[in-house]
Amino acid sequence: LVLIAVHIALPYLVRNYLNDKLANMGDYRGEIADVDLALWRGAYRINGLQIVKVDGKVPVPFVKAPLIEFAVSWHSLWYDHAVVAEGHFVRPQINFVDGGANKQASQTGKGTDWQEQLRKLLPITLNEVRIEDGEIAFHNFSSKPQVNINATAVNASFYNLTNVVDVKGKRDARFEGKALLQGQAPLEANATFDPLSDFEEFEFRFRARDLQLKRMNDF
């Protein structure tokens, strides 16, 4: 009975613990709706994460993620003898906002140590991150007409973020991603970088094709 009670109560305890940590994020505040645990495979799911700006009247959240799953990377544990995790973000949204002259109405992510916030959600280091069907948007609600530029259907991956694998003596992490710009123009991006540096050396490639400029006429 004790084990059953612990099994039932633990997700609520974890959720309350995380919400307590995310309540104080500098200029932002986070909240989680629910947590599901799968201890037998070293994984847990976060449902309904939302991060909003504390000051200013910004009409959209900075981050909204219906589902996030973190799990121990058994491949890295078995082959590289490293205890690291993989993250899977499903349909996440990020909204950047230009508030114009009203700086309080802007939303850029400044004012918070985001690496520290990620450490609150996950006690071990992330080595791989996958983003499935995400969206990145830029808004200006004060301009006339209003600006709304977005990349949808964002599918991307970050690999080797902790340098578990050295590639020919180099400490290379890499990023690969695809999306649709303004809902129709294929966008591709890839990068390599040293995850332990301050991005002093990195290579980034970006390409967008077949963008219909008439879609930008309103701006």
Regions found by a protein language model. Give the residues of each.
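Short beta-strand elements
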Residues: 31-33
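Flexible beta-edge/linker motif
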Residues: 36-101, 115-137
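N-terminal type II signal-anchor transmembrane helix
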Residues: 1-27
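Short amphipathic alpha-helical segments
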Residues: 10-14, 18, 64, 208, ...
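Elongated, acidic membrane-bridging lipid-handling scaffolds
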Residues: 24, 67, 109-215
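Flexible, surface-exposed loop regions and adjacent strand-edge segments
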Residues: 101-109
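Short acidic/polar mixed-charge low-complexity motifs
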Residues: 28, 59, 183-185
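Short, intrinsically disordered, charge-balanced linker/junction segments flanking boundaries
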Residues: 217-219
